[in-house]
């Protein structure tokens, strides 16, 4: 995968008498000051989990390199779960030494990089644009948006303002996925909890975890999706450009869990268990330090296209939906 590295221009020329001292001070600060992280949205459990891990210095390779210093609490003001969480999570994050501001701009004035953790994907475009225009390296937690259209706008803005961003689910790092020989993958069956929220298209709210797994395993060139609705689950059947087929089972009721099976040329692999957020957080912190994007935007956009097509199929009673038609409608 081609990874784009964003390089920032250095300081301009300085007066000769001040050159040594100023450069020395800048260099000293660069190598001694922790990278300051800001969080937008305190209605996600990820906001607290990430902050605790960073403040406690438990992420390998980056134990002393980062600190969360600022946060903006909102977050959805209409989703019941968010309304319930924000006051509690605000108090908890303040207890971790994080200053809470009432404007996103105030957070951006005091940080070097941003975690966009707002649970409501409908707000991500508006909030991301504020961050991107300030050129702050940005991680957007799932879902990147609530539509392919908004996701495209986010990436276009990032390109325009030369701002490094990426978005992914922690399930991309499920045990077994990263070690696959993707050239040998013939198909896959994965499963995920798929609880819904009225404000979001079907899989964007929670089932996106499973779509992330599917695209990470199969690749970004899915060409069609069909949705079959069951009583307690939904089955999503994807076809790829080379004829391969993969399925996603979205669990509506019953035991929640993540997992799956991958069919290779010479073996069948059962994926491991979800190990928490630290593998994802390691990639985020590495990204904040290097500005190298760990997940290709084409994969993120493929996830959104899959979900939009799955929603369309559901609304049309299980009709197979071509992703090219989803994309064409946005032209």
Sequence positions of predicted segments:
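C-terminal active-site/capping subdomain that shapes the small-molecule cofactor and substrate pocket
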Residues: 259-331
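N-terminal export signals
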Residues: 5-26
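NAD(P)-binding Rossmann-fold cofactor-contacting core
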Residues: 62-92
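Rossmann-like dinucleotide-binding domain that binds NAD(P)(H)
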Residues: 188-255, 301-302
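A contiguous active-site-proximal alpha/beta segment in oxidoreductase catalytic domains
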Residues: 144-200
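Glycine-centered short loops/turns at secondary-structure junctions
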Residues: 135, 162, 317-318
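C-terminal segment of N-terminal export signals and the immediately downstream linker at the start
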Residues: 1, 20-42, 46-48
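Beta-loop-alpha module in the N-terminal Rossmann-like domain of NAD(P)-dependent dehydrogenases
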Residues: 98-155
């Amino acid at each position: 995968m081609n990874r784009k590295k964003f390089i920032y221009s250095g300081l301009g020329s300085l007066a000769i008498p001040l050159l040594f001292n100023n450069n020395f001070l800048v260099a000293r600060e660069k190598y001694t000051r922790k990278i300051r992280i800001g969080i937008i949205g305190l209605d996600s459990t990820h906001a607290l989990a990430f902050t605790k891990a960073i403040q406690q210095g438990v992420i390998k390779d980056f134990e002393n390199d980062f600190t969360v210093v600022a946060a903006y609490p909102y977050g959805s003001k209409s989703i019941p779960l968010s309304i319930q969480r924000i006051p509690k999570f605000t108090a908890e994050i303040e207890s971790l030494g994080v200053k809470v501001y009432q404007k996103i701009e105030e957070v951006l004035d005091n940080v070097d990089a941003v975690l966009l953790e707002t649970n409501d994907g409908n707000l991500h475009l508006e909030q991301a644009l504020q961050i991107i225009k300030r050129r702050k390296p940005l991680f957007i937690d799932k879902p990147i948006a609530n539509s392919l259209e908004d996701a495209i706008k986010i990436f276009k803005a990032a390109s325009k303002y030369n701002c490094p961003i990426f978005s992914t689910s922690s399930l991309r790092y499920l045990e077994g996925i990263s070690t696959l020989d993707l050239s040998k993958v013939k198909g896959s069956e994965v499963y995920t909890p798929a609880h819904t929220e009225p404000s979001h298209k079907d899989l964007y709210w929670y089932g996106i975890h499973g779509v992330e797994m599917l695209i990470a395993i199969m690749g970004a060139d899915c060409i069609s999706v069909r949705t079959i609705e069951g009583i307690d689950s939904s089955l999503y059947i994807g076809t790829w450009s080379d004829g391969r087929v993969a399925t996603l089972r979205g669990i509506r009721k019953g035991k929640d869990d993540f997992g799956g099976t991958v069919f290779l040329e010479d073996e069948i692999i059962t994926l491991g268990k979800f190990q928490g957020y630290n593998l994802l957080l390691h990639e985020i912190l590495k990204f904040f330090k290097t500005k190298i994007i760990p997940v290709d935007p084409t994969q993120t956009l493929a996830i959104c296209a899959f979900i939009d097509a799955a929603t369309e199929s559901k609304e049309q009673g299980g009709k197979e939906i071509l992703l090219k038609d989803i994309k064409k409608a946005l032209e």
